[in-house]
């Protein structure tokens, strides 16, 4: 991974988030989290967690996420609000923190391996 290539960095962050959230929702496939079937509310929630980690925790601008993920600003804002509200419950907050920590550790492994090469 070229640490100066914003596209590669974004993709590495997204991949780390998808894998971490997949581990948090083990009954879902990554493809179902990336593009949730319309009637799958758990897949939609998992996707919202991914967007929340990307924006709130990894610091990607909402505008960039909207463009790259081909989502509307309203969909991204709704995802952020939904997860912010769910974070008020301790059980969900603990689960979210575990997924966030896993995403960070996965991203650290990717960047460490790249720098070592």
Model-assigned labels for residue ranges:
Residues 23-47:
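Short, Lys/Arg-enriched anionic-surface-contact patches
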Residues 43-60:
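Short, amphipathic alpha-helical "recognition" segments used to contact nucleic acids or chromatin
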